[in-house]
Amino acid sequence: MEAERAAKVGIASALLVLAGAAIAAYGLDQFSKFLVVSNLTEGEIVPVLGSALQWQFVRNPGAAFSLASGMTWIFTILAAAVITFIVWFARRIRSIAWAVVFGLLLGGVLGNLTDRLLREPSFGLGHVVDFISTPWLIPAIYNFADIAIVSSMVLFMILTIRGIGLDGNREVRATAATPAAAASDATASDAAASGGRAFSAGPELARES
């Protein structure tokens, strides 16, 4: 194994990228929800690209993509725990890509947590505003916070598969030797084989003499 340097940055740059991604995701999520609540009635469907993309205002008491309804308080606690972990863990990040991962996750989780804390019916039990409907893709209705969370998970898997660490270094396997090294190995093998044959032929020559 050998280390290959990826997009490695200092702690200040990594935190700046993380904060930027989080602010962008959170801002887009909250602004879009403000427009939806201000301009649509609950349950209303507005075609954007026919039936492929629609706005449909619903209030979701569950998790992302309207899953596990009725467990709002559990997701509120989990979201707060995730945010606390990211803030604590952020100083270890030295990679731009990983900073984007945690930034998108932070912004998305914070966006839905804001709804659960501040929206009806009560503090900590608020319903999340969902409005993006793509029936051809998934039956659930979601929002930009959900998109940010899923995007962070996809990027997380890509970075993990590629072996890129939090420090920005990538571990790669030496799958093939260089031509010079291969030629050197072949020469050494031939020499060893020739020496072995000469050694084994020695006793036979002695017996014949």
Predicted regions and their residues:
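Alpha-helical transmembrane bundles and membrane-interface segments of multipass inner-membrane proteins
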Residues: M1-S209
